[in-house]
Amino acid sequence: MGQHQSRDDSHGGDRHRHHDAGTSGPTSPSDHDPYPSRTGRGSRRNLVASIVGGGSNNELPERKETAAERQMRRLERERVARVEERERSIREEHVDGGYLVTMGVYTGPEDFNKAIVRQLMIERRVAPFWRGLEDYESDWTEHQLVAAGRGLPIPAADEIPSEDSARPHSSNSTNAPSSNLQNLTVPIASRSQSASYDTSVGRSPSHSSFNTSSPTSPLNAPATSTSLLRPRAKTLGLKSSSKEPSASDSAPREIQLPRDSQVNGQAIEAFLYKDAVECSICLIFYPPYLNRTRCCDQSICSECFVQIKRPDPHTPEHHGPPQPAPDQAEDTEMLVSEPAACPYCQRPEFGVTYEPPPFRRGLVYAKPSRELANFSSAMSSSSSITSPPITSPGLAPRVDNRRRATSLSANDSNVITTDRIRPDWSAKLEAANLRKAKKNAAASALHAAAYVLPGTSENRSYVFGRSRFGRNRSDPDNSGSATPSNRDTSSRTAAESSGQARREGRDSHAARRTRDVEDMMMAEAIRLSIVAEEERKKKAEKEAAKEAAKNAKKQAKEDKKKEKKERKSIYGTNGHSASSSMLNLGNSLAATLTGRRRGDSVASNLATEVTPEEVEEPLQGKGKGVAHPYLGNDGSATDNGLLGTQHLDPSTSSSLLETHQSIPSPTSPDKPSHLRQMSTASSASSSVAESGNGTNPQGSSTSIESPGVTDTNEGNEDGDTGAESMFNFRSLTAMIEKENDNEKTDAVHVENAHEASGSRRGSPDETASQDMDVSMETLRPRDSPQQPKPDHHVPMGLQMPAPKIDTSIVTPQLTLTPDTPALMSPTEENGKQLGSNLQNLSNNEISQ
């Protein structure tokens, strides 16, 4: 850098020396040396200075600026430039009292085209950016309206206005003939447009030549004004160095109208804000000259209008109304961006129209548009209030606030749509689609690369590119062979043959690659199927294990509930009824001694229980010759009529009593009464008695002996001399005949039967002796009442009479009937059913 700067300085110094020499006199030949830097000692001094300067710069290495810092610095410069331009525009430019820049209602980014908006505002096709009022009162005075329109503090209503706001007219605006709009153009022969004029923006700074407030401004006819523009055209035509002469010539040129702050004798701010209206979107008061929507004719300010735009490009499945079918099939995957909808009625293709105020102030174009050409006159400070109305339909003054009856088309010339102020929406949409296409192509390439064999990866991109665009086809429509050429036939034939060979090679390679891809896809499909099957099996096993655990838990819960119910039931194993214990004892004893058990009986136990009504009746017992023990407070078994019994083996009794500890209650509602249990008990007793006569192979004792019971019965009324055995067997026929004589016997209470398997529960061995003592204690009578006369009458219902005890008895009396009949025929066996006539049947006794 230092060397280049030194050379430039040396060249500059040489040029100055040449210029001085040329002006002073003749020059020497050395002055015209084309390479002055190569000769002379000055160049050496500059070279040494540059080296020294470079060395000094190397001592402090300068820090390089990053791209982010450059970007931030550039954005900051642009922001400062925008702020300055905004302040300048507000200070120097306006259109009918409005401004060409936003007033800060919205703080978001301004992404609309400012040049187009500026042009539309100068053409009076869009309302300018009015200064908004936060508050508005309809009874404000003129100087209050002026202060509000200028952004000043609003004074009191009775305050004397200042001279600037109270001055009705300008000193330079008293000439009435100079208020014609057609004569407002100024001569521009003395001012030519610079080559750096920005045609896209179309801005012209305020110059003193545009200030037409001077009374010396020329007032010429339209033809004269046209002739005044002719030198400008000649000047532009002679400029050969201009890069865009046609654009500069066609762009409209801005001019400043005479500065007049009065309209109809009052300030322009008072004229604009005396009938202020509120924008329904931003809720700010503006002059009544606002934009009107083309569809529903609603008011909307320019601040809100420039913020409405199309949505960003997105996929087409997120919007409601169906779009027309695309021409190509691939367009269905393209991004879309719908036109902006009206904020009031939600109709698409949002656009506005504008009716300007009935006067012109500020900037206009030198080449008036169609509306400005038809504009006949403008209202000025010196115009009469009763002046004729404007004849132009587009610029007619607002007569009333009647709404438009019909909506305008989006293609109407007076309608400005949101796409008009944002013409780059199509470019943004195309850019978004291009980015999506590139992303899809990259994803497709990555997906295809996963299925390419390693040996064929080098030619993949070339084949893919050739086959994608169809350049490997041999038809003349897609190749250049159909175009006539001047080449030799032989060379063309050789080229065609070589091209055909290359195409065949590519085709074979593509076919081989296709087969490889298909094989890989098949293998991948098989692998995925195997993985899916394994996952399914694992899931099924898991479900089965879960179901099994659930069933086990449910079964355990049911068992626990059943066990709890059995414990709570009166037939459960927790009861301590002596009668049930003894009945179970008799049944178990019979089964143990005889080695046989009746399997066709529903129940195997029978017990009798004394009801409270039978307590005071005399004791009477009936049965098959078996005396019922009377359990009193004192006395022996001989007084109670208990027959002599033999001793029972302690081991047998403990094993029998081990499983019988409770008796079911006869009043239980859930256990039905089975009268057939009598025969079952009788069969068991018979078997026990038969075994006691000498048939027990083990030779153990088969009789039960209670403490305090003798071998003889002294009080026997039948005259028996010896002790009658407890297990005395008689003929069933004799018992029935004997029973006919004693029909008037007391009622017998029969205890409900229950299943032996449901009421049995084993007890520990250490408690067997205690249970035996408890069971034997129930057989010990305490009183010795008179032995009742045995009665062998058996009722037809196979009911066994219960003994009558007095009130002093606490433990119920038991009756053991371990009689087991001999084998019977089916006819005799059925005779034990309810209602059968047992008198006509015969029973075979077991005889030894």
UniProtKB/Swiss-Prot annotation:
Listed InterPro entries: Sip5/DA2
Amino acid composition bias (Low complexity), ranges on this chain: 204-218, 239-250, 378-393, 679-691, 833-848
Compositionally biased residues, Polar residues: 168-203, 477-500, 571-582, 648-670, 692-713
Source organism, top-level taxon: Eukaryota
Record's GO cellular component terms: cytoplasm
Keyword list, A-Z: Cytoplasm
Compartmental location: Cytoplasm
PANTHER family recorded: PROTEIN SIP5
Homology family: Belongs to the SIP5 family.
Name of protein: Protein sip5
Organism whose genome encodes this protein: Botryotinia fuckeliana (strain B05.10)
Gene this chain is encoded by: sip5
